[in-house]
Amino acid sequence: MAKKPKKLEEISKKFGAEREKALNDALKLIEKDFGKGSIMRLGERAEQKVQVMSSGSLALDIALGSGGYPKGRIIEIYGPESSGKTTVALHAVAQAQKEGGIAAFIDAEHALDPAYAAALGVNIDELLLSQPDSGEQGLEIAGKLIDSGAVDLVVVDSVAALVPRAEIDGDIGDSHVGLQARMMSQAMRKLGASINKTKTIAIFINQLREKVGVMFGNPETTPGGRALKFYASVRLDVRGNTQIKGTGDQKETNVGKETKIKVVKNKVAPPFKEAVVEIMYGEGISKTGELLKIASDLDIIKKAGAWYSYKDEKIGQGSENAKKYLAEHPEIFDEIDKQVRSKFGLIDGEEVSEQDTENKKDEPKKEEAVNEEVPLDLGDELEIEIEE
């Protein structure tokens, strides 16, 4: 390969230096006009990894791939009626409050049950609640909360109930073609950048509708147009499967239902993973149940016949007794939970190893305390029993 003439190399270097200077001048001008951080090289970003907040369900965190809901993104949860959509969202609210954050609930359906929310772990005294009169009002309230930067999670329940003002003021039977879709499209354009900037998680619950005249393919669709589908980083399809029967006196009573949550869209991890959870009536997602199942599959909790054991210690005969043990021993629950998350790469293994190291450090201290030599005072009286 022929070398470039020396003169041509000098011209190339000079031209490259001029381009670099022009680029730096443009970057400085952009930052001056729009603020620091408005443009930067990707490698200069302080945080490359997407920050997440746990969904409140171990199985769902694993299915999401990143360990929870990504911060600064839009999440859509949809499914049939009574499938558990609001329950999944309320667990996210409880988790946000548990981590010290502030959560808001835009109840467009006017159907939130405070007692049920409290049973799921939501601090209803600290929960911000709005029951808007129209779709525009609900989205404006959500926008102001997000723009404040003080709210960590905003839940809108539901998109289908965000009725445009023109439809409310009109008569029943009036045609309002595409009105709600235009409202949602405008809201997504307006809220998208603000959500990302403030690192707020915005969860939109949606219902299902069926397209008329569809002979082939899936006739199901979600109301509110296509904007939400495009702007959402994660979309969850929630479906109730089989009913769960009780035990003992309640063996003929339905005490919950097995629910399948499918990640149909995921921009931060591989999509199409599924989580199967048990939603118990009046309690929400059974955290002990999902941990017991996943830990047993990973052989962290051993199962022999009907008995479950952890670290060679039996924790219960039958799944119900094992769940009860985990509920009564939160330190064991947290220890197993960390091991499971470490196995799936949701947390660094250092946390688990540090805990094991601390436990090992404590063991010799206990032995030293037991084997510690006590100096003998010759003035003491000793009683010696001699066996005949």
UniProtKB/Swiss-Prot annotation:
Segments for region (Disordered): 347-388
Where on the tree of life does the source sit, at the highest rank? Bacteria
Q: Which UniProt keywords apply?
A: ATP-binding, Competence, Cytoplasm, DNA damage, DNA recombination, DNA repair, DNA-binding, Nucleotide-binding, SOS response
Provide one Gene Ontology biological process annotation.
Answer: DNA repair
Q: Which GO terms describe its cellular component?
A: cytoplasm
**Claim: DNA-binding is one of the keywords in the record:** yes
Database matches in InterPro entries: AAA+_ATPase, DNA_recomb/repair_RecA, DNA_recomb/repair_RecA_CS, P-loop_NTPase, RecA-like_C, RecA-like_N, RecA_ATP-bd, RecA_C_sf
Entries under Gene3D superfamilies matching the protein: P-loop containing nucleotide triphosphate hydrolases (3.40.50.300)
Q: Where is the composition biased (Basic and acidic residues)?
A: 357-369
Q: Name one GO molecular function term.
A: ATP hydrolysis activity
Record-linked CDD domains: RecA (cd00983)
Expression induction = By competence and DNA damage.
Q: Which coarse location class describes where this protein primarily resides?
A: cytoplasm
UniProt-annotated binding residues for ATP: 79-86
| Phenotype of null mutants | Loss of DNA transformation; incoming DNA is very rapidly degraded.
Annotated compartments: Cytoplasm
Q: Where is the composition biased (Acidic residues)?
A: 370-388
Listed PROSITE patterns: RECA_1, RECA_2, RECA_3
- Keyword 4Fe-4S attributed: no
Q: Quaternary arrangement and interactors, per the entry?
A: Interacts with DprA; probably forms mixed DprA-RecA-ssDNA filaments.
The task this protein performs is described as: Can catalyze the hydrolysis of ATP in the presence of single-stranded DNA, the ATP-dependent uptake of single-stranded DNA by duplex DNA, and the ATP-dependent hybridization of homologous single-stranded DNAs. It interacts with LexA causing its activation and leading to its autocatalytic cleavage. Required for DNA transformation; protects transforming DNA from degradation, possibly in combination with DprA. Present at 15,000-30,000 monomers per competent cell.
Protein family per UniProt: Belongs to the RecA family.
Spell out the protein name for this chain. Protein RecA
Which taxonomic lineage is given here? Bacteria, Bacillati, Bacillota, Bacilli, Lactobacillales
Primary gene name: recA
